[in-house]
């Protein structure tokens, strides 16, 4: 198992609101605890922090291109726009709608 395969899987499924360490472990035929430990040892960050960073970076890029907040939320794996907006604001320190204005 190569971390690069896992990272590729994450990128390909970033839009999936069910993307989780459990799902990836199952798809890669690994135990949850082994994947969690190995991922952090290799990348230096936890699986959830890695996924959050990717989602927030992609969201910011999509918003900067003029995409609607509700569309972006869905494209980066969040069913609920309000939850996405709170996470985005906590992560970046600005509201998603403020990215559209800059």
Segment roles from a protein language model:
Residues 8, 41-79, 101-102:
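Terminal helix-turn-helix DNA-binding modules in bacterial transcription factors
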Residues 9, 21:
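Short, flexible active-site loops
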Residues 1-2:
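Hydrophobic, helix-rich cores of sensory/ligand-binding and other regulatory modules
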Residues 22-50, 74-98:
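Basic/polar phosphate-binding segments, predominantly the helix-turn-helix DNA-binding elements
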Residues 12-17:
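Short helix-capping/hinge SLiMs at alpha-helix to coil transitions
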